[in-house]
Design a protein with these regions (language model features):
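Hydrophobic, aromatic-enriched interface-forming segments
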Residues: 150-229
Length: 331
């Protein structure tokens, strides 16, 4: 049996790690002939990362390329994948911004098994795995265990844990707790953390980390209360935005702000390198992020890159004010 060297490019959030870790979890049973190499990427960087990788010697020994939780923005990048890997590349993505481009390469795009369910990258991988012959070699118990984790990731990433009226309170809390734990660990430990949850199953992992989860929930409640007091409102592109700086809990703050202030059309949460956007339905924030922040996502939830450093600007403002105060005093 010929060995397969599969290169995976994926986003660096929970869904972005969940998708490749799911594949690695079933590797022994479903992909015994394969070796996986994962590169995690921030939003808006897939094209430049692929462009760099195409020129590397690694492409000569790579048999397949899988892209998860993101889609290249450039049709040229997709054509390059087609040219170098023919029918040996796949995209597992659900973001609306690049849906039209994925449709042009439909043969290489994994679609959800149930169109009525909002997909995530992890759920798309799961749907695809279930169509492969070796899937039945997984025990029923293991299938159920993995299906639960896939659903928790999907529910959080699509925000169904907040918006689906049919979801149980237990499942909502589990999805929230899983995501909380993910962001607690530094990025370099993200894959290891997600893999440990997939190895143990959610029930066992949650029981082992009950105190930590409670501590994180308490910390988040205080953080949101504090940061939602400092909102700057601005009118841009004909819409009213509320801007908040946050280094943590960006998605939660972005979701909560329009709820607390319904007059706002959208929340824009900034951190040193990125933005998170949430809409109340009056603006397509995916298009807004694509136009102004090299990003994208969904009509009601999106993200992008921030080219200015708000921390540096804030520090400089304090320095300028200090210089002015001290010079006035000398006079």
């Amino acid at each position: 049996m010929a060995k397969r060297n599969i290169k995976i490019f994926s986003h660096n959030d929970l869904d972005g790690f969940g998708a490749p870790v799911l594949v690695k979890t079933v590797q022994d049973v479903m992909f015994p002939d394969a070796e996986f190499d994962l590169t995690s990427i921030g939003a808006g960087r897939i094209d430049s990362e692929l462009d760099y990788w195409f020129k590397s010697p690694a492409t000569a020994t790579t048999t397949d390329v899988w892209i998860m939780d993101m889609t290249p923005d450039s049709e040229h990048t997709m054509q390059e994948l087609n040219q170098q890997f023919a029918n040996h590349w796949l995209v597992f993505d659900h973001h609306e911004t690049e849906a039209a481009l994925r449709q042009k390469f439909a043969a290489n795009t994994i679609k959800p098994a149930d169109a009525k369910i909002n997909p995530s990258a992890t759920s798309l991988v799961w749907d695809w795995l279930k169509t492969l012959p070796n899937f039945e070699r997984l025990s029923q118990e293991r299938q159920q265990q993995l299906a639960e984790l896939v659903e928790l990731i999907r529910a959080y990433d699509t925000w169904d844990w907040q918006n689906d009226p049919d979801m149980s309170e237990k499942e909502r809390q589990a999805a929230d707790d899983f995501n909380q734990l993910f962001w607690f660990y530094p990025l370099e430990y993200s894959e290891k953390f997600v893999q440990s949850v997939f190895d143990k199953g959610w029930t066992t992992y949650r029981q082992d980390n009950d105190l930590l989860i409670q501590t994180l929930n308490d910390r988040r409640a205080k953080y949101l209360k504090s940061h939602l007091k400092d909102v700057v409102e601005v009118t841009a592109d004909g819409h009213q935005f509320g801007i908040v700086y946050a280094s943590d809990y960006k998605s939660e703050i972005a979701h909560e702000l329009p709820t607390q202030q319904p007059a706002l059309d959208a929340a824009l949460v900034i951190s040193p390198k990125s933005i998170s956007l949430r809409s109340n339905g009056k603006i397509d924030v995916a298009k807004f992020a694509e136009t102004y922040y090299q990003g994208g996502g969904h009509a009601d939830a999106a993200g992008g890159r921030l080219d200015i450093n708000p921390i540096r600007l804030g520090e400089q403002a304090v320095a300028d004010e200090l210089e002015q105060m001290t010079s006035v005093k000398k006079e």
